[in-house]
Every structure is written in structure tokens, then in C-alpha cells.
Amino acid sequence: MNLSTIGFQVIFKQRLRCVRFGVRCISRETLGCNSVAASSADEDDKIYVPKKPILSPIDQSKVEEPPVFDKALITHLERLSLVWFTDEQAVFNLKEAVRFANQLKLVDTTGIEPLETLLEDMPCPLREDVADNPMTKAEVLMNAAKVVEDYFVAPLENIPLEESDKLNLTKVEEFDRRVMAKKNLLNDSVKEKTE
């Protein structure tokens, strides 16, 4: 699992916990790797770590399943993101991240104005759009790596990636079945303890 995937999952879990508890809360994973938050002396900075597992208020049966990750989709995603999925575990982690993100579709956002920017309440002064030092055409074209008849020449297109035949997609599905079985077993045991 690469570092950016881990960071995304920790941040995403944090946001869902904020929705669940209605206050800022920091999970055990965040406390382990975030020494600033763990050692914060600010009284307004409340840290809540539940002592017992808390069932998710999201009905997992309503969560949309991630798409089937075939070789064509994996190659397409690799081209778009410039991230290569070197093994089955990387594809499985991507599938889990998509499954986790699909939970957001179940969050009711009616009547909530979308946040466009964190700085929407701050003034943003702009200067007048007047050229200070106008440049000549020759000076502008000096920036081009290649010029044809006083025009910039765009670089060649990206070379397409080769499809990796190394990935065993049945292993990804096997990982998926195992993890879902563990989650269902955990949810059942937590439900039995709470009842």
C-alpha cells in the first residue's frame, strides 16, 4: 500500500467520524502518526477515541459496489493518474478506497450549501490589468523549445502504456471476499455484544 493511499484513507475515515460524532475526533491511526494532534494542549481541541467499536450509521447493504476492475479499466486509470498498480494488493487497495468513498453518496446533503473555498469570506483584492513591461513577439518566442513559422510547437503526445499481464485479477477478488467476510463477522459480533 503506498503512502498516498494510506493518507487518503486516514483522512477520509477522519471526515466520516466527524460526521458520525458531530464533533472533531481523532482515530487511533491518526494519533499514532500525528504527534502534533496527540500532544496538543489546546482546550478546544477535543480528542475522542471510542473504547468500544461503534457501528457505522451507514447501512452497508445500500452502499454501491465498486466497478469490476478489469485490465482495460486498470490501464485506463494508470494512464490518467500516472500511478502504476504493480501488484494485486495495489488494485485491491484501490477497490477498497472506491468502496469506502461510495459511502458518501448516502450522506443527505439537502439544504446544505456547497463549500466552494475556505477563503470565500476573505476579500481578494486584484490589481489593474495593465501591462507593465510589454514584451516583443521575439522575446515571447524565446520561451518555446521548438518554433515553426512564429508559432509554438506542442510536444509529442504521451506514449501509451503497455498493459501489464502480470496482475492476477482473481487474486483481487479473493482478497475482496476475505475482507468482506471479516467485516461481516466483526459487525455480527459487535451487534451481538450491543444487544
Curated annotation (Swiss-Prot):
Keywords: ATP-binding, Ligase, Mitochondrion, Nucleotide-binding, Protein biosynthesis, Transit peptide. The keyword Nucleotide-binding applies. InterPro entries: Asp/Glu-ADT_sf_sub_c (IPR036113), GatC (IPR003837). Its EC number is 6.3.5.-. Residues 1-18 form a transit peptide. GO terms for cellular component: glutamyl-tRNA(Gln) amidotransferase complex; mitochondrion. One of its GO terms (molecular function) is ATP binding. The keyword Ligase applies. Coiled coil: none annotated. Its main location: mitochondrion. It comes from the Eukaryota. It is found in: Mitochondrion. One of its GO terms (biological process) is regulation of translational fidelity. Signal peptide: none annotated. It catalyses: L-glutamyl-tRNA(Gln) + L-glutamine + ATP + H2O = L-glutaminyl-tRNA(Gln) + L-glutamate + ADP + phosphate + H(+). Subunit of the heterotrimeric GatCAB amidotransferase (AdT) complex, composed of A, B and C subunits. Allows the formation of correctly charged Gln-tRNA(Gln) through the transamidation of misacylated Glu-tRNA(Gln) in the mitochondria. The reaction takes place in the presence of glutamine and ATP through an activated gamma-phospho-Glu-tRNA(Gln). PANTHER family: GLUTAMYL-TRNA(GLN) AMIDOTRANSFERASE SUBUNIT C, MITOCHONDRIAL. Belongs to the GatC family. This is Glutamyl-tRNA(Gln) amidotransferase subunit C, mitochondrial. It comes from Brugia malayi. The lineage of its organism: Eukaryota, Metazoa, Ecdysozoa, Nematoda, Chromadorea.
